[in-house]
């Protein structure tokens, strides 16, 4: 039987939500009721499958940790008042911390003036953000297209490369095994995990994947394309594969890829959606090798954890294919004043507080500690690796990795696995995480591994 729409029900539900938004605190009964509602609504209206992947939901589904507010720059508080150290960072969006006051203030001030742009009058913050990114990014990157997410920034990059290279008779893209570039149809064609790809086959033609970090395989793909007339339009890469398990290529790999692109007339697209904005100890990970891409993709932390925003930045030569018809690729909400205000404030905080350098220093502290734990628990931990505050702990199997994440949750530390490598747990906290909290995270990790070791020995 078809369900009839109910304006009364929708009105009551929205009014209830607005009442919750206004509240600063909840009493015990309100907390219990909200937990039940959220779990029920996820089951019935969002996706019940999500609950199976949440460490914060008990097996019986009778309790779930429902987030309520940021506790500080580096912590989250649930409806029960429990405070968690955030070592997940919303998959890398909270580089400047939770509710950073500079970012929040910028958005609030803009909200009081003009939340969204008219689409006809020129919006100043879009222009100022584009100018700021031109100054901040490496090489000849000059023009920016703004959107709402990392996937959208990759879609724009692929379309831009196609528009530039199609008149030159080049149509093929090289991506890499283990890559993650998003899940929309174009970005998914570059993504390499079969679980995400197979239900939507066939994807866009013209994509081939080579092993990440293997410059010989990359060179062969270029050479074969030249021989067969299937010439390469662009290479799309993450400088460090995030969802692939925080996989670092050999030193000099990006430099050699850049040389191949120059030799064969291909564009180099760097997807820094996760590695950008100071995460790896430099503002952009490509700066570790002084490599300059033709197109750069940003998102996640660009909005300061307050507003969603993505950016595709390109050289004038490449971006000029959109000059005659700027409507070839547009988005209604991309580059809106609130998002641009957040991005400008985020960049200001990153530079004023020198957070990339802090990420390098504190990342070394964390990585040294995790490597020590790997030596102490070799039957549980296979490897610890990373750069800056993008760190991975690889366990011996998927179940051990999931158990570690659950134990860390009990220690009130949020971590999670990577999408393409389930046995790898990422440590991706705000760059504002204090040294004291870094030490607490390492202590919690030691406690978690000790508890896991006891379970292994009992078996």
Curated annotation (Swiss-Prot):
InterPro entries with a match to the protein in the record: Aminotrans_3, Aminotrans_3_PPA_site, Class-III_PLP-dep_AT, Putrescine_aminotransferase, PyrdxlP-dep_Trfase, PyrdxlP-dep_Trfase_major, PyrdxlP-dep_Trfase_small
Top EC class for this record: transferase
N6-(pyridoxal phosphate)lysine PTM positions: 300
Catalysed transformations (reactions): an alkane-alpha,omega-diamine + 2-oxoglutarate = an omega-aminoaldehyde + L-glutamate; putrescine + 2-oxoglutarate = 1-pyrroline + L-glutamate + H2O; cadaverine + 2-oxoglutarate = 5-aminopentanal + L-glutamate
UniProt KW keywords: Aminotransferase, Pyridoxal phosphate, Transferase
Domain of life: Bacteria
Molecular function GO terms recorded: diamine transaminase activity; identical protein binding; putrescine--2-oxoglutarate transaminase activity; pyridoxal phosphate binding
Family matches, as Pfam families: Aminotran_3
An example Gene Ontology biological process: L-lysine catabolic process
Binding site for pyridoxal 5'-phosphate: 150-151, 274, 332
Cofactors that this protein relies on: pyridoxal 5'-phosphate
Function comment: Catalyzes the aminotransferase reaction from putrescine to 2-oxoglutarate, leading to glutamate and 4-aminobutanal, which spontaneously cyclizes to form 1-pyrroline. This is the first step in one of two pathways for putrescine degradation, where putrescine is converted into 4-aminobutanoate (gamma-aminobutyrate or GABA) via 4-aminobutanal. Also functions as a cadaverine transaminase in a a L-lysine degradation pathway to succinate that proceeds via cadaverine, glutarate and L-2-hydroxyglutarate.
Family assignment from sequence similarity: Belongs to the class-III pyridoxal-phosphate-dependent aminotransferase family. Putrescine aminotransferase subfamily.
Protein name per its UniProtKB record: Putrescine aminotransferase
């Amino acid at each position: 039987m078809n369900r009839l729409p109910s304006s009364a029900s929708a009105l009551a539900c929205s009014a209830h939500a607005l009442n919750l938004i206004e509240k600063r605190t909840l009493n015990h009964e309100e907390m219990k009721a909200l937990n039940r509602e959220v779990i029920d609504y996820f089951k019935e209206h969002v996706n019940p499958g999500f609950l199976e992947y949440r460490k914060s939901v008990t097996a019986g589904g009778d309790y779930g940790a429902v987030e309520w507010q940021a506790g500080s720059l580096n912590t989250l508080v649930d409806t029960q008042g429990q405070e968690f150290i955030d070592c997940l960072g919303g998959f890398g969006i909270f580089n400047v911390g939770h509710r950073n006051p500079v970012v929040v203030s910028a958005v609030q001030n803009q909200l009081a003036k003009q939340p969204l742009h008219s689409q006809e009058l020129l919006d100043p913050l879009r222009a100022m953000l584009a100018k700021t990114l031109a100054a901040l990014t490496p090489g000849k990157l000059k023009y920016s297209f703004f959107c709402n997410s990392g996937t959208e920034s990759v879609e724009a990059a692929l379309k831009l490369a196609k528009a530039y290279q199609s008149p030159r008779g080049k149509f093929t893209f090289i991506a890499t095994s283990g890559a993650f570039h998003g899940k929309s149809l174009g970005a998914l064609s570059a993504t390499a995990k079969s679980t995400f790809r197979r239900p939507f086959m066939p994807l866009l033609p013209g994509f081939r994947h080579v092993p990440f970090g293997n410059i010989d395989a990359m060179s062969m793909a270029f050479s074969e394309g030249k021989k067969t007339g299937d010439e390469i339009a662009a290479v799309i890469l993450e400088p460090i594969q995030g969802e692939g398990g925080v996989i670092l290529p050999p030193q000099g790999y990006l430099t050699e890829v850049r040389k191949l692109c120059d030799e064969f007339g291909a564009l180099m697209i760097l997807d820094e959606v996760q590695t950008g904005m100071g995460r790896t100890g430099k503002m952009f990970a490509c700066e570790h090798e002084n490599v300059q891409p033709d197109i750069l993709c940003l998102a996640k932390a660009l909005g300061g954890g307050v507003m969603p925003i993505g950016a595709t930045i390109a050289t004038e030569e490449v971006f000029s294919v959109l000059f005659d018809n700027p409507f070839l690729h547009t988005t209604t909400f991309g580059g809106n004043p609130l998002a641009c205000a957040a991005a400008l404030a985020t960049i200001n905080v990153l530079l004023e507080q020198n957070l990339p350098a802090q990420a390098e220093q504190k990342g070394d502290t964390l990585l040294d500690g995790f490597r020590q734990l790997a030596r102490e628990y070799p039957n549980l931990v296979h490897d610890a690796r990373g750069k800056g505050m993008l760190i991975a702990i690889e366990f011996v199997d998927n179940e051990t990795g999931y158990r570690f994440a659950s134990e860390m949750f009990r220690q009130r530390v949020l971590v999670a696995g990577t999408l393409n490598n389930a046995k790898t747990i990422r440590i991706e906290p705000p760059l504002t995480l204090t040294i004291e909290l870094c030490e607490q995270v390492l202590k919690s990790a030691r406690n978690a591994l000790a508890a896991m070791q006891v379970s292994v020995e009992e078996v």
